[in-house]
Amino acid sequence: MSASTAAPARDRLRIAIQKSGRLAEPARSLLAACGLSWRQSRDKLFCYGESLPVDLLLVRDDDIPGLIADGVCDLGIVGQNELEEQAAERRGNGLPAAYHAVRGVGFGQCRLMLAVPEEWDWQGVAQLAGKRIATSYPAILADWLERQGIEATVVELSGSVEIAPRLGTADLICDLVSSGATLAANQLKPVELVMESEAVLAGAVREPADARAGLLAMLLRRMDGVLKLRDSKLLMFRADQDNVDALRRLLPDADPLVQLPDDGNGVLRLQTMCHGAVTWQRLEELERAGAQGLMVLTVERSLA
């Protein structure tokens, strides 16, 4: 099916995620936190949604953008780098991407970087002129080189990019970097950022207008709640009215304080949602400022 052909009406939402790899488990955990559960097929590539009419397709990450563009899947969780690589490739072929990043999902952070042999004295991007650069992301790299005004040869490799300089097939590489350990093991050093990336929820530019529309809206609302609460804690404490302003200043990343019914002795009962780390040091600061009976609670679900 071409990207311009309307997808057939369906009453079940279909989401593509990585079958295996670094995004597979976090993606399934995120969707499970949204209340989804599945029954896996014998071939282990299709998971039938049981709690909601939302099915999973387990595929290679580089298949996900195309499945969305062709209307086979409504959504996918995929690296932004993979999404942009295929979008750039489609633009180069005169085709619309037909998909977009709906939102980041809070994991899979990495950087697409140029890396050179450790012995290079790196002076800047002007050194790239005439060089051979090995990468698995040729379209992104070609776009970046064009913006920099650099003429270089892009050597496309599907894997093991980091050994290309040692094999003599390239002078340097452009590859994803998380910790930098793989580069160091191959006597390479990162020198220039090409793209920041993370896992994203991707969807079709044209959203479904049939029964899937309501499912999509519900899933996105649940996902917003899960992502908002991922690093959030409910903080409850008591305090005198005179100390409230000082306590509020110690909670810049928290929602407005909510006053609960007091017990009649003039001490206020307060609670707030903190969206940053609630460390022991932070609790001790609050205590010194007048907070009493501090409690930190995990919140599993929220509909705002």
Swiss-Prot record:
Query: Into which family does the record put it?
Result: Belongs to the ATP phosphoribosyltransferase family. Long subfamily.
GTP-binding as a keyword of this entry, yes or no, is no
On whether Oxidoreductase is a keyword of this UniProt record, the answer is: no
Q: Anything known on activity regulation?
A: Feedback inhibited by histidine.
User: Which keywords, in A-to-Z order, does the entry hold?
Assistant: Amino-acid biosynthesis, ATP-binding, Cytoplasm, Glycosyltransferase, Histidine biosynthesis, Magnesium, Metal-binding, Nucleotide-binding, Transferase
Give the GO molecular function terms. ATP binding; ATP phosphoribosyltransferase activity; magnesium ion binding
Which organism is this protein's natural source?
A: Xanthomonas oryzae pv. oryzae (strain KACC10331 / KXO85)
Q: Which reaction does it catalyse?
A: 1-(5-phospho-beta-D-ribosyl)-ATP + diphosphate = 5-phospho-alpha-D-ribose 1-diphosphate + ATP
Q: Which HAMAP family match?
A: HisG_Long
Give me the gene this protein comes from. hisG
Supply the name of the protein.
ATP phosphoribosyltransferase
One record GO biological process: L-histidine biosynthetic process
What the entry lists under InterPro entries is as follows:
ATP-PRT_HisG_long, ATP_PRibTrfase_cat, ATP_PRibTrfase_CS, ATP_PRibTrfase_HisG, HisG_C, N-reg_PII/ATP_PRibTrfase_C
Question: Cellular component GO terms, alphabetically?
Answer: cytoplasm
